[in-house]
């Protein structure tokens, strides 16, 4: 009789550990996003709960989404290439020349 109650207690304990373990596991992307001050941390948290109902299909994408952002560099997709800066300077110079030509022709 004692072993029946003990087995029932172990079964309930294992069920609770698995239940709360899955919940904690799905909060990992949110915790990463919160630590990195991610601008979409709330959306990642909600999507983590939605992934519980979608059989965890989107959970790996949430992990990637949470780890892509860093406050010091943003999304890491900005290109600070020198050629872009040179082109911007050339365009500014051409616009200045065009404005000078327009002002001289108006006189």
UniProtKB/Swiss-Prot annotation:
Periplasmic domain ranges by topology: 30-43
Localization annotation: Cell inner membrane
Record-linked InterPro entries: UCP028770 (IPR011223)
Keyword presence, Cell inner membrane: yes
Topological domain ranges for the Cytoplasmic compartment: 1-6, 67-107
Keywords linked to the UniProt accession: Cell inner membrane, Cell membrane, Membrane, Transmembrane, Transmembrane helix
Parts of the chain that traverse the membrane: 7-29, 44-66
Topology of this chain in the membrane: Multi-pass membrane protein
Gene Ontology cellular component terms for the protein in this record: plasma membrane
Family: To E.coli YibI.
Entry protein name: Inner membrane protein YiaW
Gene this chain is encoded by: yiaW
